[in-house]
Amino acid sequence: MAGLKKSTIGSGYQFVFASTDASTSTGSIGTNYNGDNVIYFRDDLISLNLTPNAVFRDLSAWYHVVVALDTTQSTASNRAKMYINGTQITSFSTANYPNQDTEGSINLVSGSYVHRIGSYNGSSNFFDGYLAEVVFIDGQALDPFDRDWET
């Protein structure tokens, strides 16, 4: 979970978080400014891609973003969830869910995945904005209201 506030509406992808390996298989939470202005959650290693229909253009607003991944769930749409400002996002332009019992690149035990906050690979796709209270919790999926937040 993280609080984010954009500084500009630019172009291209800007990463709030990325987990990458040498073959560019990526797990990420980020924003896309190619005219979309969306906040997305994806993990190429397990074919996860959640891209909401909603757009987020307000440069004065803080967005509280929570993503939860639990691939042990039997229902595909319960394996990956996204909440923005405490509301679960259920309308997506793209919604690809991982297979059951698969391990994504975020917090991957094996492999050489490097985790970065605010960048894709340390030298590109920097997040142009503010981040607050970036928290990773492994082993459990918390409710989006387990932490206080303000918009």
Name the predicted role of every residue range.
Residues 41-64:
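Short, aromatic/His-centered strand-loop micro-motif at the edge of beta-sheets
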Residues 74-76, 93-96, 130-151:
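Extended recognition patches within non-cytosolic domains
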Residues 1-11, 65-67, 117, 131-136:
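Short hydrophobic/aromatic patches on beta-strands that form ligand-binding or substrate-lining surfaces
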Residues 2, 60-71, 82:
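Short tryptophan-centered beta-strand motifs in secreted/extracellular beta-sheet-rich domains
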Residues 105-131:
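Extracellular glycan-interaction patches encoded by glycine-rich segments
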